[in-house]
Regions:
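N-terminal binding-site loop/beta-alpha segment at the start of enzyme catalytic domains
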Residues: 2-12, 19-140
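Beta/alpha (TIM)-barrel catalytic core signal, keyed to glycine-rich beta->alpha loops juxtaposed to Asp/Glu
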Residues: 4, 36, 40, 63-65, ...
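Structural preference for beta-strand elements that scaffold enzyme active sites
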Residues: 78-82, 110-111, 139-145, 175-180, ...
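Short, acidic/polar
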Residues: 92-104, 155-170, 219-223
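Structural motif
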Residues: 107, 170-171, 204, 259
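Active-site groove signature of glycoside hydrolases
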Residues: 168-189
Length: 372
C-alpha cells in the first residue's frame, strides 16, 4: 500500500559504482539550464523537521519503494528525487534514455522533469514513447516546462496553449501533472499567463502550476492574482545547491515558506563537482561547463569536498548522495532535480532517498559552504 508523507527518506551504495561526474551539458543548441545531467520508511520527518542526532546510513535494497511524498497542497505523491531529462535526445539517445528511465522506475522514482525546449522536444518524445511502451503513465508524475521553445517563445496566452498541446502530443498523454513556466516573461502580463493556464486546467490538460527562475517579488504578485481566482503556483524550481545558496536562502526561501511552495532545486550537483569527479583542472574538459566547474576549484570547494569525503567514508555512500541529502533536509525542499549520463549513476542519486544527515553533519556542511 502506498504511503504518503510530507518529505524525507534512506540506501546503500557500492563503492565500485560509476561515479557521477557530469550533471548536465552546459552548451549546445537546445541547452536549457534545468534538470541536471549528471522501501518506504514510516519515520520520515515533515518538511523542515530537525535532523537526527546521528547520520542514518542507507539500507541495502534494490526493490521499488512504495513511499511517496505529497507535494504541498496538491494530490500528487512523488519520489524524493526528480529525474532531470535535459540530455534526453541530445547526449543520450533512445537506448540509453530508456535504460535511465527504467532504472529510475525500478529504484522507486516516479517524478520526471522535462521541458519542451530540451533537445527541441525530443526529450518529451522519448519520455512519452517509454511511458506508452511500459504502460506506466499513471505511475508517473510528469512535469514539463514551457516558455523557451523557439516555436512557442514566451508566456503569451496563445503561445501557452500551443505549447501545452504540442507537449501533450509528444508526451502521448492527455494531461500534464505539473506545468512549469520555464522563464519569467516580463513582456507579458502575469495575469494573461495565469488566465491561459486556468483555461487549460478547466479543460483537464494541466493539473498544477509551477514557477522557475521567478524572483520573490513576482511570486508575491502571482499570489495576489491567485487570491482573485487565478491559478496559484504550487511548486518552485530554482538553482540551489551546497555551492549556490545565497540566491535561494535569502528572499526566495522566505516566500516559498510563506506561500507553501514545494521547492525543486536544480543544479543540485553543481555540474558534477559535488559528485567528487573533479579535483583538479586537469580533470576538466575545456568548455563552458568546464569553466563553471573550474570556478569551484578553490579553497571553499576543497573545504566542502573534504567534509563530504569524511561523511562518505563514515557511511559508505557516494558524494552525490550526500549533496542531495543535504538539499532534502532543507525547509520546503520537495525533490531535487537530478540528471545522469548513465543508468548506473542513478544508484547514488536515489540512495539520497534513504539517507539522512545528522545535525552535526548538516552544521559542518553549512559552515563549509557559508560564503557564496
Amino acid at each position: 500500500m502506498t504511503q504518503f508523507v510530507r518529505v524525507g527518506a534512506r540506501k546503500r551504495v557500492d563503492e565500485s559504482q560509476e561515479p557521477i561526474v557530469a550533471e548536465i551539458p552546459a552548451v549546445g543548441p537546445e541547452y536549457s539550464p534545468h534538470s541536471g545531467a549528471i522501501s518506504g520508511l514510516p519515520d520520515i520527518p515533515e518538511l523542515g523537521a530537525p535532523a537526527p542526532e546521528e547520520s542514518m546510513a542507507p539500507s541495502p535494497s534494490n526493490a521499488r519503494s512504495a513511499e511517496r511524498h505529497q507535494i504541498a497542497d496538491t494530490e500528487l505523491g512523488v519520489s524524493s528525487v526528480a529525474l532531470g531529462t535535459s540530455v534526453f535526445g541530445w547526449t543520450l539517445g533512445i537506448e540509453m534514455a530508456t535504460e535511465v528511465l527504467g532504472r529510475y522506475r525500478e529504484l522507486g522514482g516516479n517524478f520526471i522533469d522535462t521541458a519542451d525546449s530540451y533537445a527541441s522536444g525530443r526529450s518529451e518524445h522519448l519520455i512519452g514513447s517509454w511511458m506508452r511502451e511500459e504502460r506506466c503513465r499513471d505511475e508517473m508524475v510528469l512535469s514539463t516546462k514551457i516558455g523557451r521553445n523557439p516555436d512557442f517563445q514566451g508566456l503569451g496566452a496563445a503561445g501557452i496553449e500551443r505549447a501545452v498541446n504540442a507537449s501533450l502530443r509528444r508526451l502521448r498523454t492527455d494531461r500534464i501533472d505539473v506545468l512549469t513556466f520555464h522563464v519569467d516573461d516580463r513582456d507579458v502580463e502575469l495575469e494573461e499567463s495565469l488566465s491561459a493556464v486556468d483555461a487549460l486546467m478547466r479543460a483537464g490538460k494541466v493539473r498544477y502550476l509551477a514557477a522557475s527562475n521567478f524572483s520573490a517579488d513576482r511570486l508575491l504578485e502571482a499570489r495576489v492574482l491567485a487570491a482573485n481566482g487565478l491559478p496559484r503556483f504550487s511548486l518552485l524550481q530554482t538553482h540551489y545547491s551546497l555551492l549556490h545558496r545565497a540566491e535561494y536562502e535569502s528572499e526566495l526561501a522566505l516566500v516559498a515558506r510563506a506561500q507553501g511552495l514545494a521547492v525543486m532545486p536544480y543544479f543540485a550537483l553543481a555540474n558534477g563537482f559535488l559528485a567528487g569527479g573533479y579535483r583538479s583542472r586537469a580533470s576538466i574538459v575545456p568548455s563552458t561547463r568546464g569553466l563553471r566547474i573550474g570556478a569551484h576549484l578553490n579553497r571553499r570547494g576543497a573545504r566542502v569536498l573534504s567534509v563530504m569525503d569524511r561523511i562518505a567514508g563514515d557511511f559508505n555512500v557516494q558524494l552525490a548522495t550526500i549533496a542531495i541529502a543535504w538539499l532534502r533536509a532543507k525547509s520546503s525542499v520537495c525533490a531535487p532535480v537530478v540528471g545522469v549520463s548513465s543508468a548506473a549513476q542513478l544508484d547514488a542519486v536515489m540512495a539520497a532517498s534513504d539517507f539522512r544527515l545528522s545535525r552535526s553533519d548538516m552544521i559542518e556542511l553549512d559552515r563549509a559552504t557559508a560564503a557564496n
